[in-house]
Amino acid sequence: MASVRAAAVAGMFYPADPRSLNAELDELLGGIDAPAPRLGFPKALVVPHAGYLYSGPVAARAFEELGAARGIVRRVVLLGPVHRVPVRGLAVPTVDAFATPLGNIALDHAALASARELPHVVASDLAHLQEHALEVQLPFLQRQLGEFSLAPFAVGDATVAEVAQVIERLWGGPETLIVISTDLSHYQPYARACEIDRATLTRIASFATNLDHHEACGATPLNGFLAAARERRLSIKLLAACNSGDTAGGKGQVVGYSSFALYEPGAELSLEEAGRTLLAIARAAIEARLFGAAQAIDAPWLRQAGATFVTLTRDGALRGCIGSLQAERSLGTDVAENAIAAAFRDPRFPAVTPAEWPGVRLEVSLLSAAKPMRFADEEDLLAQLRPGEDGVILEHEGRRATYLPQVWESINDKRQFLRELARKAGLPDGVRLARCTILRYRVTKWTE
């Protein structure tokens, strides 16, 4: 029978009820205004570990960076400081899985066995039993990654080199994500905490490896990780920072929070290069149908999940447009399939012919994840819309339609934009927009 570490702080640091937890994750992740679509994802995150009421928004900003990692990251190496049980070195559990209200996460016993070959890595279920620093990250990871295995380390008294050695051993490839759990300064007055934390953020961004526990409670795992990251020449990006006085606490004694994303060299693909590749995939897919087999185009970043629209024009007029609103296929596959559908299966147009093909031009739009809009009434909805930036999905009574941001070029009035979108969805002219579900997204587009 499998042994499972039960969730220790569900109901305290985050909701114990699965439905309530999912709703809170929706709120935290949905509260990040629809970001631009991402190509690639971080190798590592640094995230805080207080209750979601306090540090949840800062943590969510980091986990939002994993939007393209689902289906690629299969293992998470998670390190955080011990708060309850003293440990010499790094402690790993012996149980088979960690539980959260969202389900069980299997442990990667091969990875943990490899780490235990090092003399400073010990087995201790007790060190993990009540530890919150690791547990609070798990629901975010489950939401963003889906299925993955976990290699958790409760870090006690260890040197920079000892922590770095463990991280190096489990570094892996794109299938492995490293997460470091740490808060910043503790129990300082608000102004003093801001001063201390600003200096600490600068030191983290410069890969300092001598942070102390007054600067970051997780200084021990963080220092070791920064040493490994510096050796591998990762780039680092500060995503968010605040303290409990900015969220749900008073300003007399506060705790600081920050989140960082770190990228391996070459992981952040240039938009220009990505656009050339996606347009080439779209054109090759259509030409393969028109003229025969074409050479396949592949790259690791094309295997991430992606949602795209492919638009065909001829002599400046629309010739076909088909796309995906959710990232359910690999990016390369999604572009190719949508290109074929736009050329041959758009019901508004006849199939593209070889004779007209030389005059057809392509546009590929890469969509961010759609975020639900929250509004009090129709006027509030209209006030929030951003012409030229927002792609909009309108849903009501089982009907749905979308307009890409490009449509603002021809319909620049907000109310008319939504009315035309409702009409596209097959809704009556008098439908009350405030009763519709409205989501928005952003796109990055490339045109031949």
Name every feature range the model reports, one short phrase each:
Residues 2-248, 266, 275:
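Active-site histidine-anchored catalytic micro-motif
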Residues 175, 233, 254-259, 359-361, ...:
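Active-site lining segments that contact anionic ligands and/or coordinate catalytic metals
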Residues 140, 152, 257-259, 281, ...:
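Conserved hydrophobic/aromatic beta-strand scaffold that supports enzyme active sites
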Residues 267-448:
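Basic nucleic-acid-binding interfaces
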Residues 197, 246-261:
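Conserved, well-ordered active-site substructure
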Residues 257-262, 308-312:
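Short beta-strand scaffold segments in enzyme catalytic cores
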Residues 236-249, 418-430:
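Low-complexity, intrinsically disordered Gly/Pro/Thr-rich segments
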Residues 191-194, 251, 369-373:
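Short glycine/threonine-rich loop-to-helix capping motif typified by GTGT followed
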